Amino acid sequence: MQSRPAQESGSASETPARGRPTPSDAPRDEPTNYNNNAESLLEQRLTRLIEKLNAEKHNSNLRNVAFEIGRPSLEPTSAMRRNPANPYGRFSIDELFKMKVGVVSNNMATTEQMAKIASDIAGLGVPTEHVASVILQMVIMCACVSSSAFLDPEGSIEFENGAVPVDSIAAIMKKHAGLRKVCRLYAPIVWNSMLVRNQPPADWQAMGFQYNTRFAAFDTFDYVTNQAAIQPVEGIIRRPTSAEVIAHNAHKQLALDRSNRNERLGSLETEYTGGVQGAEIVRNHRYANNG
């Protein structure tokens, strides 16, 4: 009879124990989640570190750094800002650099003249895609023969599925600009063409040029470095040497003297000329002392 209260008390003491979580009832995945998150963060840091190190790798080492193009432009103060309406305003270097100035030479064919020449050549029946090639072949030929206004050329210029007389191309150029002006416009192109083919003007020896100056034996040699002329894509292969410049200028002076012997006469009437050519212009270079 006394054992029942003992059972009741024992069951009463067991009831609150069920409400308390025992160590075995605690969630077991919390340490696992923490470890996974820590591992993921470490992997992210490792990935970012590798990416940063890869971005810093390079195979160049810049030295003597100096940039002008693309640098931030400065804004001058109000006292130094130029008034565009004042012709005496002082231009800054930045303003001069940004100013678009075309390089012009009055001794070459202009764009308008070249447009007329191209139009007339196309009017002969030359396909438009071959007009530039025909012009270039003409000026290369003139480097071997002459670009004189008195030139009477022979032969024809060929292109794909056709040909055109040289006389026709020369006449068109002489009519609109002058043959020599067109040749001056293409002087750098002709210079590169001769050098890359190792093909100097054909008459260089007959003109008195030495072997080391043979590439200077054409009329428009003195326009090879002119920036107003049409430039090759890569630039000229090499600049003319001093020996080539001296040889060209000497020959040019002799040629001008020979052709200008009648320019000394005030009139070409027989009363002045006596029916003969003017006296030869003589220049004695034997006594030139440049040493």
UniProtKB/Swiss-Prot annotation:
It is found in: Virion. Residues 1-36 are annotated as: Disordered. Residues 1-14 have a biased composition (Polar residues). This is Capsid protein. Its main location: virion. Coiled coil: none annotated. InterPro entries: Carlavirus_coat_N (IPR013569), Pltvir_coat (IPR000052). GO terms for cellular component: helical viral capsid; ribonucleoprotein complex. Keywords: Capsid protein, Helical capsid protein, Ribonucleoprotein, Virion.
